[in-house]
């Protein structure tokens, strides 16, 4: 998820052996907090479907919160392990080595699952010229707000809460919904004897 220029980063993943690449880009996603980001990504993952393991980074460089991966797992009802430094896949199970402050923890989890990984996980593959040329035939799908939207009420999931404050005030003060009070704290029209 990012601006159009993020396609180059996804292409690099294709150069290094990924089968498909997906980019979520739209001005509607700009400035999204972790909840909005995880909602958009989970919606895209549901739309793409057919996955065993969703692998993400430990944290974003802009927010540095490490919340998006676990929030996606929650929205997709998947088991998740964070700070993964090693992965071994066997049938429908994944054994991971999770980085801790004072060592490692080995965890076995069933697929489908979501893993957020530390940079020590592996060394990037060498990109051959042939591989770079071949990747241009691999699909890079672009998703935007229109291709991802599922229900109009969920539109709010893509925006920061503070952007919705004006909309909330309008709903609260809409005709028939608002109440007026006098200086004594009594609702106008009420009679107190």
Residue ranges and their predicted role:
Residues 1-193:
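N-terminal glycine-rich FAD/FM-binding segment characteristic of electron-transfer flavoproteins
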């Amino acid at each position: 998820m990012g601006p159009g220029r993020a396609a180059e980063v996804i292409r690099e993943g294709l150069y290094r052996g990924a089968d498909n690449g997906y980019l979520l880009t739209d001005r509607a996603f700009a400035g999204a907090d972790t909840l909005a980001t995880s909602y958009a990504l989970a919606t895209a993952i549901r739309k793409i479907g057919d996955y065993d393991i969703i692998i993400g980074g430990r944290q974003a460089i802009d927010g540095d919160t490490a919340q998006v991966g676990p929030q996606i797992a929650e929205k997709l009802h998947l088991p998740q392990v964070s700070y993964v430094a090693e992965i071994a896949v066997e049938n429908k199970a994944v054994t991971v080595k999770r980085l801790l402050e004072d060592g490692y923890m080995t965890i076995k989890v069933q697929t489908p699952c979501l893993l957020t990984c530390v940079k020590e996980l592996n060394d990037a593959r060498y990109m051959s010229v042939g591989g770079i040329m071949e990747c241009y035939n691999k699909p890079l799908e672009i998703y935007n707000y229109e291709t991802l939207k599922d229900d109009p009420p969920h539109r709010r999931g893509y925006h920061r809460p503070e952007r919705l404050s004006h909309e909330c005030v309008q709903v609260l003060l809409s005709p028939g919904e608002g109440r007026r009070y006098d200086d004594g704290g009594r609702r106008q029209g009420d009679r107190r004897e």
